């Protein structure tokens, strides 16, 4: 990240504020003061957390927590790249929070709070900022997380939003990508392929009569309730953002082994199964579902002797998990279907 001379938290002396606009685009009427919009839009997002210092200072002060590790993750999204430019901004806000929460879930970390950065396109109106803040507030209450600070700027480019999330994990118990061993089972939460199909539905390329797949794409469900079961049973994990095949391969690479994915055992929703039933080639259809991404499920390595106990613990947390493959000697990722080896035509999304 490039160095910045700007303050790391939103506060009353920032030059660029939540409602900042170019002078040429400013309305004739005087805009609200910085105190007004910080108090009205941003301060409520702190939910009274003393760490945020009411957004009156240049930094947040985070107390240490003996016996715990601080887990930090960051995601950024750009209009026209990660979401449609015309997407409702409360939806954008909620997806930003949920993708970060999914990263913490993969580490079995308890979410604590977040720092926010927004690059508003020049000329953005007050209503846009209000809608964005509403989405943050809704999910802040839903997931019990608070805004701790951040920054806003005005840009000549598209809307850019970024969040840095903090979470706690008992010392030494953070689940990493490395840790899988040959013989471990590959297991995944929820269902696979709905996020990708939801994106296609948003483009009008697939039918989504009840809107279930579109909801999965726009508002993923981070598996934050799975952390206790993971701490006991998971040896390595990742969240499924780039695609099940790609993210499984990340675990294998970090762990120094190979992962084999059984395409026949992919857990599918009724909508995904209906789509698959219409495909002329089952294997290619399953590869598409396993490489599409945006599922935000948890894929993990579990000792074979722990697999059943993990299922039970996950079910108690309200999450279904399925066994979909195994780790073996070697490197990389491979797939098979009905006992026959398959070479995937793609694994998932690549980051530039």
Swiss-Prot record:
List of residues binding Mg(2+) 4: 58, 73, 103
Family annotation (InterPro entries): PurM-like_C_dom, PurM-like_C_sf, PurM-like_N, PurM-like_N_sf, ThiL-like
Positions that bind substrate: 82, 294, 349
Residues binding Mg(2+) 3: 58, 103, 239
Pfam families referenced in this protein's UniProt entry, alphabetically: AIRS, AIRS_C
Keyword Transcription regulation: no
Metabolic or biological pathway, per its Swiss-Prot or TrEMBL entry: Cofactor biosynthesis; thiamine diphosphate biosynthesis; thiamine diphosphate from thiamine phosphate: step 1/1
Residues that hold Mg(2+) 1 according to the record: 75, 151
Binding-site residues, Mg(2+) 5: 242
Binding positions (Mg(2+) 2): 75, 103
Gene3D superfamilies: PurM-like C-terminal domain, PurM-like, N-terminal domain
Record EC number: 2.7.4.16
Residues given in the record as ATP binding sites: 150-151, 177, 241
Gene Ontology BP annotations: thiamine biosynthetic process; thiamine diphosphate biosynthetic process
Family membership: Belongs to the thiamine-monophosphate kinase family.
Its job: Catalyzes the ATP-dependent phosphorylation of thiamine-monophosphate (TMP) to form thiamine-pyrophosphate (TPP), the active form of vitamin B1.
Misc. comment: Reaction mechanism of ThiL seems to utilize a direct, inline transfer of the gamma-phosphate of ATP to TMP rather than a phosphorylated enzyme intermediate.
Protein name, as recorded: Thiamine-monophosphate kinase
Organism for this UniProt entry: Caulobacter vibrioides (strain ATCC 19089 / CIP 103742 / CB 15)
Gene that this polypeptide is encoded by: thiL
